[in-house]
């Protein structure tokens, strides 16, 4: 039986990834010799037996106790909070390990290329939205009712915006789901690369942002 890879609204999931490969990527010993596949990486609460999760802070110990994940990236100090059904994978730096595995599942999550297929809003399915001048819209964008969009704003592919939202001028929205009744001010950038990185001797390691932190 081939299981469907978990879908993601913005990035393509390249799973499954085996436990053997996870250990190879992280340069750690594989204590389990049997072949186990992971279909996604998820937070403690969302994870299931087919996904790998992570536990990096004691403040999440109550959630960790109830996780449904079969394996968890964690530290030696935190491993005893995990339930019996969840095997710890001990690493020196949990978040750096999460970044490395997330990059394998979602390699294009580290890219920050602009959407070169945007259209003028007048030529898109969102033309009925009240908008200013020079507004650009990507493919598969959904905008709810009673929304306003200011001048020179770009809303890139797959972005969903709820009802009663106000988007300011000179704003870029990418890789985002905006709920109802949200106001975004002028000159905002949402969904692009953030400040998530880990210092390294050779170069900074970028932390992929896929909505699990």
Feature locations, PLM:
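Terminal amphipathic alpha-helical/low-complexity segments used for targeting or macromolecular assembly
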Residues: 1-122, 181, 187-188, 192-206
